[in-house]
UniProtKB/Swiss-Prot annotation:
It holds the Pfam family Ribosomal_S8e. It comes from Methanoculleus marisnigri (strain ATCC 35101 / DSM 1498 / JR1). GO terms for molecular function: structural constituent of ribosome. InterPro entries: Ribosomal_eS8, Ribosomal_protein_eS8_arc, Ribosomal_Se8/biogenesis_NSA2. Residues 1-35 are annotated as: Disordered. One of its GO terms (cellular component) is ribonucleoprotein complex. Belongs to the eukaryotic ribosomal protein eS8 family. This is Small ribosomal subunit protein eS8.
Length: 125
């Protein structure tokens, strides 16, 4: 568990004096960091008793072709680019906005694999 609330320190190094302590709504978790590989998912209990599917490894993506309106399940071959972090390409991490190479061609991921549990992508022209 990770606390994601505001720091108790000011930019000057002094302390903020708050009227409340840490709240349960401010906790978070470590990122799932979805890789290319044999499918592995983890179900996580979230706030309010709901569930979130975390994709740890995925090998298929649902790719849509905007020109023809066709959508197909295709195999992910490689991660070609990722504007979030250049190291994500080396580590083959799947994140929203990453450019992947599929059997249909190059595509941009539009879903959040570590939050949704699936990779949805749109084919690049």
């Amino acid at each position: 568990m990770q606390w994601q609330g505001r720091s108790v320190r000011k930019p000057s190094g002094g302390r903020y004096h708050t009227s409340q302590g840490k709240k349960r709504t401010e906790i978070g978790r470590a990122p799932a960091e979805t890789h290319i590989g044999e499918e592995r998912r983890r179900i996580v209990r979230t706030f309010g008793g709901n569930q979130k599917v975390r994709a740890l490894r995925l090998e298929y993506a649902t790719v849509s072709n905007p020109a023809t309106g066709e959508t197909k399940k295709t195999k992910i071959e490689a991660v070609e680019a990722n504007s979030a972090d250049p190291n994500y390409v080396r580590r083959k991490l799947l994140t929203k906005g990453a450019i992947i190479k599929t059997e249909m061609g190059r595509a941009r991921i539009v879903s959040r694999p570590s939050q949704d549990g699936v990779v949805n992508a749109v084919l690049l022209a």
